[in-house]
Structure formats: C-alpha cells, structure tokens
Amino acid sequence: MMRTQCLLGLRTFVAFAAKLWSFFIYLLRRQIRTVIQYQTVRYDILPLSPVSRNRLSQVKRKILVLDLDETLIHSHHDGVLRPTVRPGTPPDFILKVVIDKHPVRFFVHKRPHVDFFLEVVSQWYELVVFTASMEIYGSAVADKLDNSRSILKRRYYRQHCTLELGSYIKDLSVVHSDLSSIVILDNSPGAYRSHPDNAIPIKSWFSDPSDTALLNLLPMLDALRFTADVRSVLSRNLHQHRLW
C-alpha cells in the first residue's frame, strides 16, 4: 500500500516537474525573442579606401525601390476577423484614414530593424517607395517611416502599377529609364515579374520579432552600389530562388 502511494507520489512529482520545465522553457524563449527584438544593432560603416572611392565615382548612384506591406511593415485594420499578429501585440503606430467615405484605423507593425536599415541604405542609395496600396494609406505609412528625415521623398502607389490577371505589376521604368541602376526589394514576385533581374526577393513578414532579414541584406546592398549594372549580379540569384 505504501509502495503504491510512493509510486503515485513520484509520478505526480515527475508530471509536475515536466510541466514546470515546459513553462520555464516557454518563458526563456519569450525572453530571448524580446532581447533579440530590442538588442542594439550595429553595422559599421567604415571609411572607403581610395580604391573604393575611385570605383564608386565611376558608376552611377543606384536607386533602391522599396515595397511597404510585408516587406518593411505589416498592418491590419478594424474588422479583421483573423488578424495575423498575435493578440495583445501593440502596434508601432496607428493610422486613421478615410477610404470610400468610411474612416478606417490601421494598426501598423514595423519589421524589426527597419529604422536602422533605412538610415544605413539612405546613405548608399536614392530611396523610392513603390507600393500597390492606395495612396491615402501608403503615403501615411511612408511619412511615419521617413520620420521627418526626407529620405523617402519619391513615392509611387497603386495608380502607378499595371493590373494584370488580378495582380499589380510595378514597372520600374516609371521610376527611371536606366534599369542598370535600379534595385527593387519586394516580398511579392508578381510585383516585379517584368523586371526579375532587378529584384531582391524577401520573405513576407507578419509578426516575428526575431526576424533579421533587413539586417542580412545590408552587406549585399553595400556591395551592389559598386557595380556598373545591378542585373549582372541579381540575375544570378534567380537560379537559386533565394529569399532573404
């Protein structure tokens, strides 16, 4: 009888310990995600050598075309039954816009490290926003990301896209006639189907706080600005189907 009670007690203890350990692991992972999200980010911009300066002076300044939704930010609005963001996650900012005479609130979440990313690449490229979203929404998002830095002054919206088979195509020749100097960063392959050799694909982002895709792109973007034609490099990525 006593042995049976001891076994039952031991099993109860083991079950409790297992649950306690699982809860501890959950808290640890949550803390790690928080630390990663808010850790200090550094990407040292070293002075260019004389050789690098000379090389850069011989090529045109490049243009980096940036998509918004699921590339730099993710948003959802009032009335969404199944939001893609975990309930309780506070937005980075809220936009109130009027669409078809109806006020709509958008809860906008910034992709991890987007502010740092924009700060760095604005020193290397002329930045252009090109979104398939409506101008009244896209303009408000771009204003927030620009944050009075005047780095996102050129902007293109849905009316500048071409609608084909239900999807919006972004014609980069609208931005500049010289396609050798244009790079587009977009999560939607359909958006750049007319210019695949100018594209850097990036994974769609919704809510992962540990995402580092924008940081991972910095070395590549740093190197691309030295090329005579960005397509000579980016066209090779097509065969690998690599997403950043």
Curated annotation (Swiss-Prot):
Cellular component annotations (GO), alphabetically ordered: cytoplasm; endoplasmic reticulum membrane; lipid droplet; Nem1-Spo7 phosphatase complex; nuclear envelope; nuclear membrane
SUPFAM superfamilies, A to Z: HAD-like
InterPro entries associated with the record: Dullard_phosphatase, FCP1_dom, HAD-like_sf, HAD_sf, TIM50
Catalysed conversion reaction: O-phospho-L-seryl-[protein] + H2O = L-seryl-[protein] + phosphate; O-phospho-L-threonyl-[protein] + H2O = L-threonyl-[protein] + phosphate
Residue ranges crossing the lipid bilayer per the database entry: 7-29
Coiled-coil portions: none
UniProt entry keywords in alphabetical sequence: Endoplasmic reticulum, Hydrolase, Membrane, Nucleus, Protein phosphatase, Transmembrane, Transmembrane helix
Biological process (GO), any one: mesoderm development
Domain FCP1 homology span(s) in chain numbering: 57-224
CDD domains (alphabetical): HAD_FCP1-like
Pfam families with a match to the protein in the record: NIF
Membrane association type: Single-pass membrane protein
Main location: endoplasmic reticulum
Gene Ontology MF, one: protein serine/threonine phosphatase activity
EC number(s) recorded for this UniProt protein: 3.1.3.16
Subcellular location: Endoplasmic reticulum membrane; Nucleus membrane
Family, per entry: Belongs to the dullard family.
Quaternary structure and partners: Interacts with CNEP1R1; the complex dephosphorylates LPIN1 and LPIN2.
Function: Serine/threonine protein phosphatase forming with CNEP1R1 an active phosphatase complex that dephosphorylates and may activate LPIN1 and LPIN2. LPIN1 and LPIN2 are phosphatidate phosphatases that catalyze the conversion of phosphatidic acid to diacylglycerol and control the metabolism of fatty acids at different levels. May indirectly modulate the lipid composition of nuclear and/or endoplasmic reticulum membranes and be required for proper nuclear membrane morphology and/or dynamics. May also indirectly regulate the production of lipid droplets and triacylglycerol.
Name of the protein this chain belongs to: CTD nuclear envelope phosphatase 1
Lineage of the species this protein comes from: Eukaryota, Metazoa, Chordata, Craniata, Vertebrata
Gene name per UniProt: CTDNEP1
